[in-house]
């Protein structure tokens, strides 16, 4: 699947939360929080169908949309893309960056240590 834009992520979050969902329901929800024009939202939906992120099913006079990929799959792909683009694929460089920028709290560090301990090979 191709990477999805920030705007497409907003559509995906609605679809993941309420799948299956009609196009008008997606428009109603996103228009309320983003102020986007309904045509813009329909364009984003079409792009996501083209990218294979959501599927459309004809239901009488309207289309019903549902996620073709899970949120976890998209997060994994976005994470890998981000790591590759910003840190040459190095998770160590990412964590080092957060430590150097003083972005990790003591609680964050403890949680990371627990995650590392539980996943030690």
Identify the role of each PLM range.
Residues 9-14, 25:
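Pre-recognition alpha-helix immediately N-terminal to the DNA-recognition helix
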Residues 52:
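Glycine-centered, phosphate/nucleic-acid-interacting loop/turn motifs that mediate DNA/RNA or nucleotide
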Residues 15-19:
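Short helix-to-turn junction characteristic of helix-turn-helix DNA-binding domains
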Residues 3-7, 59-77:
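Short, cationic-aromatic polyanion-contact patches
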Residues 42-46:
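Short, hydrophobic-biased segments on the C-terminal half of alpha helices
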Residues 21-29:
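Short acidic, hydrophobic short linear motifs in intrinsically disordered regions
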Residues 77-118:
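Amphipathic alpha-helical dimerization/coiled-coil segments
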Residues 28-36:
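Short helix-coil junctions and helix-kink-helix linkers
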């Amino acid at each position: 699947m191709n990477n999805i834009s920030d705007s497409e992520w907003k559509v995906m979050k609605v679809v993941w939360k309420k799948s299956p969902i009609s196009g008008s329901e997606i428009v109603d929800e996103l228009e309320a929080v983003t102020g986007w024009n309904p045509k813009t939202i329909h364009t984003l939906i079409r792009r996501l169908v083209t990218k294979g992120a959501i599927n459309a099913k004809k239901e009488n006079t309207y289309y019903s949309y549902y996620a073709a990929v899970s949120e976890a799959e998209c997060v994994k792909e976005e994470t890998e893309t981000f790591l590759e683009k910003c840190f040459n694929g190095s998770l160590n460089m990412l964590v080092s960056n957060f430590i150097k920028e003083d972005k990790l709290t003591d609680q964050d560090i403890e949680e990371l240590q627990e995650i590392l301990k539980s996943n030690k090979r």
